Amino acid sequence: MGVKEIVSNRKAFHHYEVLETLDAGIVLTGTEIKSLRDHGGNLGDAYVTISKGEAWLLQSSIALYRFGNINNHEERRKRKLLLHKYEIHKLDARISQKGLTVVPLSFFFSKGFVKVRIGCCRGKKAHDKRQSIIEREKNRELAAAMKRSYR
């Protein structure tokens, strides 16, 4: 079985420069898994924090399961990330550096389990955002020119 992406945080790639990525497991309830299978998640303003030696995903939204009953999950709650101790220490050291933060980049299925791809990021300034847009446009024009030349 391959990797199937469920939800991606496109806003993170626009607002942050991703320096390093890491895949982590996540503790979810049954209705959260079912809701994610229906692509019912949002990572727009989510972030990762470390407290008491554990990594937590905050402000992530997983939509309520439409067939759920009274035992349905809370839409926005703290969700524990499953990482090795050395990975947590490494993330904690990165977070303590000025200007760095850890944000979730995507939810994906790997071998039937939901995983979270998190990234150590540095915030982009306005001119950096414009520069990345200009580079993206140049690459798009170059690809279009190459495609026309092969016809």
Swiss-Prot record:
The keyword RNA-binding applies. Its main location: cytoplasm. Keywords: Cytoplasm, RNA-binding. One of its GO terms (biological process) is trans-translation. CDD domains: SmpB. GO terms for molecular function: RNA binding. PANTHER family: SSRA-BINDING PROTEIN, TMRNA-BINDING COMPONENT OF TRANS-TRANSLATION TAGGING COMPLEX. Belongs to the SmpB family. This is SsrA-binding protein. It comes from Chlamydia trachomatis serovar D (strain ATCC VR-885 / DSM 19411 / UW-3/Cx). The lineage of its organism: Bacteria, Pseudomonadati, Chlamydiota, Chlamydiia, Chlamydiales.
